[in-house]
Design a protein with these regions (language model features):
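Intrinsically disordered, compositionally biased charged tails
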Residues: 1-4
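Conserved, well-structured core segments that form or line functional sites
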Residues: 110-125, 130-131, 136, 140-144, ...
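Phosphate-interaction motifs
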Residues: 6-114, 131-132
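Residues at secondary-structure transition points
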Residues: 80-83, 145, 149
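Conserved small/polar residues in nucleotide/adenosyl-binding loops
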Residues: 151-153
């Protein structure tokens, strides 16, 4: 599936448009999800295939925006047991592919619902490999993500 097709799929679900902007004015465009808002933090990446809920609640990611490199994040949903702490530490989350419906008997919420409940601003539909290379080369730069529906790109 090419980028144009992927964006058409995400747009048909009417998520607000979103962007990631770095201090050096480099912009990545995506589709917003999770809590509608704007947040700023150090942008890092995580290459794990699983444990996205634990990663978002891990204190070592305090005040960071996490770029998840694995393309299928969210397919097992979320629950109340898979947390690293009682508090959500991450400021934002970035995903490659549209979040799918959960397929796990333990799922209580979709990842999108859980992000909204915990006020985590998210983006999907970004080229996370390109973003990871940028982060690797720049050393976890400061960035801002916004998925307010008022943004027109």
């Amino acid at each position: 599936m090419n980028k144009k097709q992927k964006n058409k799929i995400a747009i048909k679900h009417q998520f607000p448009t979103g962007i990631l902007v770095f201090d050096n004015k480099i912009v990545f465009k995506g589709i917003g999800l999770g809590h509608q808002g704007t947040t700023t933090g150090e942008v890092c990446f995580n290459t794990s295939l699983t444990r996205y809920q634990e990663i978002i609640s891990d204190p070592s990611y305090a005040s960071q925006i996490i770029n998840f490199t694995f393309p299928h994040i969210g397919n097992v949903g979320t629950n109340n047991e898979d947390l690293e702490s009682d508090k959500i530490w991450t400021r934002g989350a970035i995903f490659n592919s549209e979040i799918t419906s959960p397929s796990n008997y333990r799922a209580l919420k979709t990842l999108d619902e859980w992000l909204k409940k915990n006020k985590i601003v998210g983006l999907t539909g970004l080229d996370t490999r390109s973003l990871t290379n940028f982060i690797r080369d720049k050393g976890a730069p400061k960035g801002t993500i916004s998925n307010l529906s008022l943004i027109h790109i």
